[in-house]
Amino acid sequence: MIEIFKTDIKHKAATKQVLTEIHQQWPGIVATFDLEDNDKILRVVGAWAPVPTQEIIDLVKTRGFMCEVLHD
């Protein structure tokens, strides 16, 4: 399953912190950022399990950033 999130994260240091936390909490998840996109995309792939969508949103928000599912 793949989930795409819109964020307001602009700096690589912040993305590294968020990605580290995601990968520690959910080892089966692969997550990447695309900061060149206007929506500052967070792409999350769950190979063996569904993506914990709300938990990912909550994690990013507790770090002081906006995060929402990007709908087609």
Q: PLM ranges: what are they?
A:
Residues H23-Q25, E36, L59:
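A generic structural signal for short, solvent-exposed coil/turn residues
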Residues G28-F33:
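A short linear hydrophobic-aromatic micro-motif
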Residues M1-H11:
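Short glycine-/aliphatic-rich beta-strand segments at the starts of folded cytosolic domains
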Residues K6, L19, A47-D72:
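C-terminal structural segments of small proteins and small subunits
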Residues N38-V44:
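Surface-exposed aromatic
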Residues D34, V45-A47:
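Acidic/polar N-terminal loop/beta-strand segments that form early-domain functional surfaces
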Residues I9-W26:
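Short amphipathic alpha-helix segments
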